[in-house]
Amino acid sequence: MGLPKGPEGQGLPEVETREDEEQNVKLTEILELLVAAGYFRARIKGLSPFDKVVGGMTWCITTCSFDVDVDLLFQENSTIGQKIALSEKIVSVLPRMKCPHQLEPHQIQGMDFIHIFPVVQWLVKRAIETKEEMGDYIRSYSISQFQKTYSLPEDDDFIKRKDKAIQTVVDLSDAYKPRRKYRRQQGAEELLDEESRVHSTLLEYGRRHGFSRQSKTEKAEDKKTALAAGLSAAEKTDAHEEDELQAAEEQRIQSLMTKMTAMANEESRLTASSVGQIVGLCSAEIKQIVSEYEGKQSELSAEESPEKLGTSQLHQRKVISLNKQILQKTKHLEELQANHTSLQAKYSDKKKTLTELKNHGEKLDQEQAALEKLEAKADPSILQNLRALVAMNESLKSQEQEFKAHCREEMARLQQEIEILKAERAPGEKTISSGEPQGALTSTMTHNEDLDRRYNMEKEKLYKIRLLQARRNREIAILHRKIDEVPSRAELIQYQKRFIELYRQISAVHKETKQFFTLYNTLDDKKVYLEKEISLLNSIHENFSQAMASPAARDQFLRQMEQIVEGIKQSRMKMEKKKQENKMRRDQLNDQYLELLEKQRLYFKTVKEFKEEGRKNELLLSKIKAKAS
């Protein structure tokens, strides 16, 4: 892709590019990366590869929160200096972003996509990471702002149960906290060793610490087992010492207990009769408290172990999640419908524009064909007549200019003669008055009348010539207008290019609209099938218990299920058949497309050969003319 050469044949400095398959593959991969990252401007077919790649790199850099001093929004087809300046500004930002790949401005300007690809790949990756970070930040910020103003039903329920649960825990801790049952008597001797003080404190709160006292039956059983096992004398001695230590410990505890008195407040123990009276009087309140305690315990167990929920709660959660999914799908469907409506309106406008352009093109083709027929039929005579009229127009214009100049000269001469006659007439009158003869006066009057007559004749002649010239000019203007109405070869080529561009744009919009139609129909069918499935499952769930109540109802229910399954199988077979038909149609269209591609290739090959033969023909004609001269 070099620059045009100068008049001396020396070319300007060219930028080396590798226009091979690898470059095209890399360009395609770069554009796919940019589109996948969200830069949909790369899809526009009218933009050059430089604008797409540089615009995509700038978009990635700005997405990563880095500033680039460029303006690429509506400045396309820039000069080489502007392209190099843009490339230098982009390259200067890459080191600040800590890009691991090296890139030079001339590589961007020269479209060296092999070296541009790793940089674009890194920029796209960085842009996607930045977008994810910003998305997480915006999501957390949105959640925090939402929680400042609104709250979910689950949060409201938790807040309502929170105070109740805290009060329950406090009540339980108060109910089961350690309570003092005994108190040391005043005037009792002070305990000196730490172990005795610990035992005394534990005994005050009703807790015994030390050897547990075994019953006589347990001791007898231990002795029997020991004798049956044949214990030795040493083991008997150890058992006896252990009994003595236990007896001493019990005696010490009893001595400590004798020095304590029972508490005489509300914490003291109640008798059996008082307990019976309280239970008889407050049985309803006790039942209510027990039921509240069981409810709190069930709520706490549900919060602590959600995996142990019942089937009804699990079903309710599933229903809530399904309702949320249905709302999301409905919202998505509304967005698709709105997008479909806008695209349908655009498609209608484009289709109308295409129809108008086609009609105008057909009209132009008809007029061109009619003019070509007229030119083929009466080309020589019309052209000769046109040339004669143009030459006549030019000659009449020159004659008009000459005649105007001649008339001015004649008018000046006549005015001069009139002045002379006026000057001569004054002394003539004097002679008449003096009694001279009247012959001179008569000759002068005759000469004046002759001049007036000649002047009127020339004036009438000029008027007729002007009328003739105006008629000829009108005819020439009509012919010029007819000639201008016929488009030239360059204009026809421009019309053709523009029609091709419009056709490509309309075909792209049409293809995209068809894709949206297909997606919408697919989602609509999916929605219909899901609704049918949900209604079927709901009806099965509602009628299952009734159907299982009796054998006749169960048989009828099974028959209905078999009919439903058979209908589903038939629907599936229809869809499979439709799928096979679409597949066969796709294969046929693919074969037709391949045939058309082969014809197009043959057409291009034939055109190329025809151009080559035409070039050879021109060379031969030039050689023949050179030899003839």
UniProtKB/Swiss-Prot annotation:
One Pfam match: CCDC93_CC
Protein's cellular compartments: Early endosome
Chain positions covered by the region annotation Disordered: 1-23, 209-246
Annotated region (Sufficient for interaction with WASHC2C), positions in chain: 446-629
The keyword Cell membrane is assigned to this record: no
Top-level taxon of origin: Eukaryota
Keyword Cytoplasm in annotation: no
Parts forming coiled coils: 231-430, 558-599
GO cellular component: early endosome
Modified residues (Phosphoserine): S298, S301, S305
Sorted UniProt keywords: Coiled coil, Endosome, Phosphoprotein, Protein transport, Transport
GO BP terms: endocytic recycling; Golgi to plasma membrane transport; protein transport
Main location: other
Cystine bridges: none
Start and end residues of each stretch annotated as Sufficient for interaction with CCDC22: 1-428
Biased composition (Basic and acidic residues): 215-225
Subunit structure: Component of the commander complex consisting of the CCC subcomplex and the retriever subcomplex. Component of the CCC (COMMD/CCDC22/CCDC93) subcomplex consisting of COMMD1, COMMD2, COMMD3, COMMD4, COMMD5, COMMD6, COMMD7, COMMD8, COMMD9, COMMD10, CCDC22 and CCDC93. Forms a coiled-coil heterodimer with CCDC22; this heterodimer interacts with the guanine nucleotide exchange factor DENND10; the interaction is direct. Interacts with WASHC1. Interacts directly with WASHC2C. Interacts with SNX17 and SNX31.
Main function: Component of the commander complex that is essential for endosomal recycling of transmembrane cargos; the commander complex is composed of composed of the CCC subcomplex and the retriever subcomplex. Component of the CCC complex, which is involved in the regulation of endosomal recycling of surface proteins, including integrins, signaling receptor and channels. The CCC complex associates with SNX17, retriever and WASH complexes to prevent lysosomal degradation and promote cell surface recycling of numerous cargos such as integrins ITGA5:ITGB1.
Family: Belongs to the CCDC93 family.
Protein name: Coiled-coil domain-containing protein 93
Organism: Rattus norvegicus (Rat)
Gene that encodes the chain: Ccdc93
